[in-house]
UniProtKB/Swiss-Prot annotation:
Belongs to the pleiotrophin family. GO terms for molecular function: growth factor activity; heparin binding. This is Midkine. GO terms for cellular component: basement membrane; cell surface; extracellular region. It comes from Gallus gallus. Disulfide bonds join 36-60, 44-69, 51-73, 83-115, 93-125. Induction: By retinoic acid.
Length: 142
């Protein structure tokens, strides 16, 4: 019975020591942090090509920093990777133009990015949709 109690006590001491070390590390990170509150961040610049891992530079008074960032490879370049939008469903296909459109309302601007409040996106109607429409027309005539 004694070895079991000794092991339990040892485990509790190790757990307490680990928690104390984590707390000390967290306090150290806070002390290294900046007192400056008004940071201005630039855009995320990818290391290669136009997406993937990269860096963003920020400045506040005399201080400057670089943060790691990531640009998704499916981002819409004209909106910027730091502008997040909530999009509605795609509208119907226009017979005149052959495109369908939808709008997006700004949800969040990251790192003080300058974003448009509302954006509009259009894309061509797919051949698959046209084929489905023709198939439906044919079935109704029988």
């Amino acid at each position: 019975m004694q070895p079991r109690g000794l092991l339990l006590l040892l485990a509790l001491l190790l757990l307490a020591a680990a928690a104390e070390a984590a707390k000390a590390k967290k306090e150290k990170m806070k002390k290294e942090g900046s007192e400056c509150q008004d940071w201005h961040w630039g855009p995320c610049i990818p290391n290669s090509k136009d997406c993937g891992l990269g860096y963003r530079e920020g400045s506040c008074g005399d201080e400057s920093r670089k943060l790691k960032c990531k640009i998704p490879c499916n981002w819409k370049k004209k909106f910027g990777a730091d502008c997040k939008y909530k999009f509605e469903s795609w509208g119907g296909c226009s017979a005149k133009t052959g495109v369908k459109t939808r709008s997006g309302i700004l949800k969040k601007a990251l790192y003080n990015a300058e974003c448009e409040e509302v954006v509009y996106v259009s894309k061509p109607c797919t051949a698959k949709m046209k084929a489905k429409a023709k198939a439906k027309k044919g079935k109704g005539k029988d």
